[in-house]
């Protein structure tokens, strides 16, 4: 059985975000656990903090690198140097970080379960409708086959039967016709209900995606707040923590919540903005060229079905024109500029377009069969390349892939990254936070610095570094021994121009 949910872009986006949220939740729990043990181990000084730093480092190894994880890595290093922290710090951490985090994580877990249940419920509706269509189709095919057999029996035995026997067969044929029409209408209604259940499921995925995205933003903000609280308490301790705090301060000053949220959006983005909805098309007994039905009989039965589709297409087209007029009025009139009304109207437009595409695909398929029967060229339609078949035992099924825009706007990179004038300035700085351009300035490393990301430089005490760029968040960009990268400004001192020339010549 084909799964109608597998290739849905909405489903892929939601699952990707759900997986990302699970990793984020695990990371947040690891951080909370580390802070709790940090608070408990404060009274045991260096030994306890050393073990905790190792635990934190392991937790960070399985976490995606970003601003927050880098800052927490520096927090791990500060734990190694803060062996003399006393009980007051532990209580402050427990009260201001651990307790709020537990509350937020507990609330988010309940919300995520509720969102998952809602998605699963609507997904089951899509699958059930899909299965009902196939079941109704099989039933209609069998009834049509029996009806045709009875029809041919009546036609072939008109001359050999008495009037009474002939009337009996005609009554039986009439009942069979009524039953067939009822089953045909039931199958048609189930087929038409397919698009509404599909839309409901996709809309639920979209809404649940937005809700889960807000939870992730809240979690990132919580981690940032915890990190800032942690920094403030560390700053209260004396001269013994000065060197350690310099390191963690540099890392915290580099934290950019918006950058992490952008990373979240990029991590969960899909590769293609194209969304294809798969819908079953109505298949009829009359379409199969292998059945014993004659051509004229086929044509007489297909034409009413085609007429029904044409009437529905005309109605849907009129509805579309009306929606377009309303949408145009909303956009042009200031009194109707309500964003929610426009969003609702766009949703109705999307629903109408999907219904119209389904009707046109069904109409094209039946028109093509009728054209073959009447020995004339097949009609042309864009959906001809989007209709596919697959076989299941003795039956074949037809479905159409309808391309639709994703209503959820994922990454608006063009707007967020382009300059105000719309042109790329080749002479502009690669980062908006650059405060000055340093042309061949030199500086000397005062402390050893171990790089934690690929774009950072390793420094040894006494190294002479060429500075290319100074940034306001406390990090500079330079080169050392042929390698370029970032390094903390607090770890170096600038050399005067003359000293820099001497160091260069040496």
Swiss-Prot record:
- Where is region (Disordered) located? 413-435
Q: Which residues form the SH3 domain?
A: 438-497
Q: Which PROSITE patterns match?
A: F_BAR (PS51741), REM_1 (PS51860), SH3 (PS50002)
Q: Which residues form the REM-1 domain?
A: 292-372
Name the predominant localization.
membrane
GO-annotated cellular components: cytoplasmic vesicle; cytoskeleton; nucleus; plasma membrane
Q: Name one GO molecular function term.
A: DNA binding
The alphabetized list of GO BP terms reads: endocytosis; negative regulation of DNA-templated transcription; signal transduction
Highest taxon above the source species: Eukaryota
Which key words tag this protein in UniProt?
Cell membrane, Coiled coil, Cytoplasm, Cytoplasmic vesicle, Cytoskeleton, Endocytosis, Membrane, Nucleus, Phosphoprotein, SH3 domain
InterPro entries recorded: AH/BAR_dom_sf (IPR027267), F_BAR (IPR031160), FCH_dom (IPR001060), HR1_rho-bd (IPR011072), Nostrin_SH3 (IPR035656), SH3-like_dom_sf (IPR036028), SH3_domain (IPR001452)
The protein's matches in Gene3D superfamilies, at most eight in alphabetical order, are given as: 6.10.140.470, Arfaptin homology (AH) domain/BAR domain, SH3 Domains
List modified residues, type Phosphoserine: 114, 479
Q: Extract the SUPFAM superfamilies matched here.
A: BAR/IMD domain-like, SH3-domain
Compositional bias annotation for Low complexity: 419-435
Q: Tell me what turns on expression of this protein.
A: In F9 cells, by retinoic acid (at protein level).
Subunit text: Homotrimer. Interacts with NOS3, DNM2, WASL and CAV1. Interacts with DAB2. Interacts (via SH3 domain) with DNM2; this interaction allows the recruitment of NOS3 to dynamin-positive structures.
**According to its UniProt entry, what is the function of this protein?**
Multivalent adapter protein which may decrease NOS3 activity by inducing its translocation away from the plasma membrane.
- Please provide the record's free-text comment about the domains of this protein: The SH3 domain mediates interaction with NOS3, DNM2 and WASL.
Q: What is this protein called?
A: Nostrin
Q: Which organism is it from?
A: Mus musculus
Write the gene name. Nostrin
